[in-house]
Amino acid sequence: FSDQQIAQLLEISPNIVFVDSSPDERRFDSVVLNFRLGVEQALDYLLYKGHRKIGFLGPAYKLDQKKRPALEARRQYFIDYMKNAGLYDEHLIIDTGLSAKDGSAQIRKWLEQKDHIPTALLAYNEESAITAVSNLREVGLRIPEDVSVISFNDTPLSILTELPLTSLT
């Protein structure tokens, strides 16, 4: 929301609750996804399934409400969890940037380093997961036999893929 839009909303009511993010967390309440819990649940599940070489797919930064670079929380929660588990490997973090085109190029570049292929990937959204699945299959890897993929944002996009995605909401 722009400052002008927020001012217009405040003219209607001083009681504003934002959904999915907040333009100013000190002034406004918000309802947001618990990304930390989602990352923990996904990684707990993958570890339970026997995976130890788990990668993360997503941007290092995203744009905040005012279009400023902000750390991507899911990525940081992933790094923290994997470090605490003694399984963190910086080579398994793929910085995809913010577009599918950038992501696809980064995934292809990363796949050329054959010794850094994980047995599982946690993608920060479905677009990244779909891009990863496509690129993994292009180099002959099977999903989920060779690489399991879990994504965030369980949207209708996940059912439009040839292989159904495992997604967190």
Please report, for each region that a protein language model flagged, where it lies by residue.
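Bacterial carbohydrate/catabolite-sensing allosteric modules
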Residues: 3-169
